[in-house]
Amino acid sequence: MFLADGAGSVSQGGEGATLAVNEAMAYMSQKVQGGELGLNDILATDIVLTVRQRLFAEAEAKELAVRDFACTFLGLISSANGTLIMQIGDGGVVVDFGHGLQLPLTPMVGEYANMTHFITDEDAVSRLETFTSTERVHKVAAFTDGIQRLALNMLDNSPHVPFFTPFFIGLAAATQEQLDLLPKLLKQFLSSPAVNERTDDDKTLALALWLP
């Protein structure tokens, strides 16, 4: 699972986010086909370098600065062999290894309160934060900063459990037909007045369960 959120202050932030996610997915597809993966910092760094290479190439092709494609970047890879989480920027990845929801990596903030870091930054690789576990994740919810105030208890950056619980209950109980409707229902929820009263930013939420 990969998420990216384009910087609102640049001209190609949305395209940068799309390119980042697509490149990460393509890279992982190749790695999976190639055999067993090591879920470690090396893999996370390789993914970030690959994404950066794609963004730099796109910027050069369009004769733009790479900062015009600035975006945050979050990723989670989990298998029976373990779990790897990676992050550059704000937003978060909430997981449950069977012991309750937790936020292994804290959303990044920049020099000022409303700033963060981007995968296009010169120091992005050194800013990259990772979390590894030998356990397979049971539940995961990844989100961009647009719903950070809904998803987290801001005092201690812990998951706001009542926000996530209905989603996971719905996922676990859904039929295939209902699963096909969930993206539309999720979009309606994220666009609802109740949510928009709490945030005026773009909102992305990705959910997954490991089914027995």
Features from the language model and the residues they span:
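PP2C/PPM-type serine/threonine phosphatase catalytic domain
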Residues: 1-212
